[in-house]
From Swiss-Prot:
Residue span(s) of domain FAD-binding PCMH-type: 34-221
Pathway where it operates: Cell wall biogenesis; peptidoglycan biosynthesis
Tagged with keyword Protease: no
Catalytic activity entry: UDP-N-acetyl-alpha-D-muramate + NADP(+) = UDP-N-acetyl-3-O-(1-carboxyvinyl)-alpha-D-glucosamine + NADPH + H(+)
Species name: Methylorubrum extorquens (strain CM4 / NCIMB 13688) (Methylobacterium extorquens)
Keyword Repeat assigned: no
GO biological process, one term: regulation of cell shape
Catalytic residues as annotated in Swiss-Prot or TrEMBL: R179, S228, E298
Lineage, highest ranks first: Bacteria, Pseudomonadati, Pseudomonadota, Alphaproteobacteria, Hyphomicrobiales
Protein name per the record: UDP-N-acetylenolpyruvoylglucosamine reductase
Function: Cell wall formation.
Amino acid sequence: MTAHSLIDAIRAAAPDLRGRLLENQSLADLTWFRVGGPAQVLFSPADEADLSAFLAALDPSVPVTVIGLGSNLIVRDGGIPGVTIRLGGKAFGSVEIDGETIRSGTAVPDMRLAKAAAEASLDGLAFFRGIPGSVGGALRMNAGAHGGETTDVLVEVRGIDRKGEVHRFTHAEMGFRYRHSSAPDDVIFTGATFRGRPGDREAIEAEMERVTAAREAAQPIRERTGGSTFKNPEGGKAWQLIDAAGCRGLIRGGAQVSEMHCNFLINRGGATAADIEGLGEEVRRRVREHSGFELHWEIKRIGVEASPA
């Protein structure tokens, strides 16, 4: 089915949709690597009710992919077939605080969540200042940094399944472990409730400044990068294993292993998604051969490879 006919079918099934539907929309500008092919159809729902109606009407055979800020993501050069959903706007991008309870939309950047908590003198969420993604991504992978993880402060998650039905997941039902949650893959997270603890605003903001300084000193944040590439294996640190295998500065096409922090891949300019993913696989191979450790991707890779020329 072509993008145009898919959109026609969606509009026929859900004529009252209020969100934006775009066909063959480039995704490169929506990822931090600035690479990747187009979304066959990109949908940005107006609010939760709009998303629910869309999913309820969508043919279940049409694949659905969800993206956030694109900071921990490689979109392959052939693009993403089916429907890609990107949440945004006030409906998914607001933060509300009531006492020690923080309610956030899943399109909220993690750094803004940390700032909002600090402004309310709520401690425990400063680590989010060091995570360059959105709340939705943090929920999906139990994101963490600088000694804190999402699981430490989460109370409840709200989401919608492929049938358009709304669900709530308790902390226990999320099944968090290191860089992973056990929530159903077909659920799109729309909101989350966190709990902070009373603290001193100046001390919290000082901790956030420390997190920011540590990140700027150790990570290539001014480069086009997707963030931390591989999970730390049990008994080792990914960057040390990569360095020991001689991969610091390794180049493939327009992609390079960062000289500054070798668990980061960067787009030097003109890289393709295949360059970046291929470089990552070469790093995995060299680490395996050098130390026996198997590195697993932390960066999510989605879409299809480009067709041969």
